[in-house]
């Protein structure tokens, strides 16, 4: 069980260090928002594929919604789900803080970007539903590539850039 907990924490930390770090790098390298989003998308797609592949034999939810669905499907217990969610949120916050730090920002740098509105909420519902659909309908052998591809696409077809992850939403509030 410890390896599953370690996988959830470390995998979520690396995922959100990648998401935020690649966004910061993209902004540092270009004032073109499209190029920044493209860089952010590519880094996230590669990281997701890598993380799901290496941690998949242990646990690779990295997302409280995915863990809750696995609880409903009776694939994990309530206790395991609760610990996963705590570790996922903690990992996301740590990953964001590390990204801030390695780019010489204050580790805790609260977001100033307004991220509110019904359109963003609906965008996140759509992104999360699509993610769950991909996870539940993909074969185990293909889940890494299908999740990575879907999230890469969802960065571009959702107005929210597809957080699709409550741990990430909390973690990203620690960065602009």
PLM region spans:
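Membrane-interface helix-loop junctions and terminal tails of multi-pass membrane proteins
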Residues: 1-176
């Amino acid at each position: 069980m410890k390896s599953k907990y370690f996988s959830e924490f470390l995998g979520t930390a690396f995922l959100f260090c990648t998401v935020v770090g690649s966004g910061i790098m993209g902004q540092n390298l270009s004032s073109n928002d499209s190029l920044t989003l493209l860089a952010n998308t590519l880094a996230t797609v590669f990281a997701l594929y890598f993380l799901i592949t290496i941690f998949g034999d242990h646990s690779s939810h990295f997302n409280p919604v995915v863990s809750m669905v696995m609880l409903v499907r009776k694939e994990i217990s309530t206790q395991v789900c609760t610990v996963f969610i705590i570790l996922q949120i903690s990992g996301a916050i740590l990953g964001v803080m590390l990204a801030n730090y390695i780019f010489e920002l204050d580790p805790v740098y609260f977001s100033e970007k307004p991220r509110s509105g019904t359109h963003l909420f609906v965008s996140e519902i759509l992104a999360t539903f699509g993610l769950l659909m991909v996870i539940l309908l993909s074969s185990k052998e293909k889940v890494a590539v299908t999740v990575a591809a879907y999230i890469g696409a969802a960065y571009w077809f959702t107005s929210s850039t597809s957080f699709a992850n409550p741990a990430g939403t909390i973690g990203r509030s620690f960065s602009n």
